[in-house]
Amino acid sequence: MSESMRNSGLKFCTVCASNNNRSMESHRVLEEAGYDVSSYGTGSAVRLPGLSIDKPNVYSFGTPYDDIYNDLISQSEDRYKQNGVLEMLDRNRKLKKAPEKWHDGRKVFDFVFTCEERCFDSVCEDLMNRGGQLNLIAHIINIDIKDDNENAKIGGRAILRLADMLRDKVFECEKNGTQFEDFIMDVFTEWQEKYPKLPLTYSAAYY
């Protein structure tokens, strides 16, 4: 069985505040590995660095990455090229059209990776408010990742490693006729030993 076929059965999601940096780097890494992945933000709006610290660029979710890219170029191409924002947006627009808000999405995922505690809390609260009518379990996993280019890349690789470990355990449990949920904490423990600087929090939720 090819890697892409092995990965096609599970649905993954990555979530950060603005659906631009951490969630999109993890989205890219998982997609390139053959996973079925979507990504979202939980913030009230998309916020990116501005020309001054006290004046960030603020956009509505759904604003195309192309439009954001062109707006920043019109402000100062040199500034946004230097701080890596244009490179980030260029990556993003190759993956999908626009940043999406978690609360507007209605897809069902097996695993949701959030990149900071407030995003984790927001996802868990939203799923609880939806009422679990489908009675489908979702594994919500928070990995604290600093919001900068370098840490987004480190976090993306770490999330891919965890996705691979979870996938392998799912297939092993299906083969052996055992319950995956009985072994998920063992997977987290093994992963956390490899990545002690990326604290992990977990909660089960229901669609």
Curated annotation (Swiss-Prot):
InterPro entries: RNA_pol_II_suA
GO BP term (any one): mRNA processing
Molecular function (Gene Ontology), one example: protein serine/threonine phosphatase activity
Keywords: Hydrolase, mRNA processing, Nucleus, Protein phosphatase
Subunit structure: Component of the cleavage and polyadenylation factor (CPF) complex.
One Pfam family cited in the UniProt record for this chain: Ssu72
Protein name: RNA polymerase II subunit A C-terminal domain phosphatase SSU72
Catalytic reaction list: O-phospho-L-seryl-[protein] + H2O = L-seryl-[protein] + phosphate; O-phospho-L-threonyl-[protein] + H2O = L-threonyl-[protein] + phosphate
EC number: 3.1.3.16
Protein origin, superkingdom: Eukaryota
GO cellular component terms given for this protein: nucleus
Function, as annotated: Component of the cleavage and polyadenylation factor (CPF) complex, which plays a key role in polyadenylation-dependent pre-mRNA 3'-end formation and cooperates with cleavage factors including the CFIA complex and NAB4/CFIB. SSU72 is required for 3'-end formation of snoRNAs.
Family: Belongs to the SSU72 phosphatase family.
Compartmental location: Nucleus
Entry keyword ATP-binding: no
Higher taxonomy: Eukaryota, Fungi, Dikarya, Ascomycota, Saccharomycotina
Residues of the signal peptide: none
Top-tier EC class: hydrolase
